[in-house]
């Protein structure tokens, strides 16, 4: 797992924002939601924004997380999506 200190600063469960930046693709937001659904089923409405040159797309999604491990698992799973460059 990742070596994070989320448990020192957050009280669980809580709403946690994830921003996924990847190659511009019409399906990126759907793929992000599909991965989140595997780890935290729910009804999600992500927001997305295309970069100024149209090369990248950022998808922001808020997820109710239950632990530090839950956050780390989501970071790792989201980063594994094809075309994803960063997860913030």
UniProtKB/Swiss-Prot annotation:
Gene3D superfamilies recorded: 3.30.70.260
Organism superkingdom: Bacteria
SUPFAM superfamilies: YbeD/HP0495-like
InterPro entries for this protein: UPF0250_YbeD-like, YbeD-like_sf
Coiled-coil parts of chain: none
One of the record's GO cellular component terms: cytosol
Family: Belongs to the UPF0250 family.
Name of the featured protein: UPF0250 protein Sama_2593
Organism: Shewanella amazonensis (strain ATCC BAA-1098 / SB2B)
High-level lineage: Bacteria, Pseudomonadati, Pseudomonadota, Gammaproteobacteria, Alteromonadales
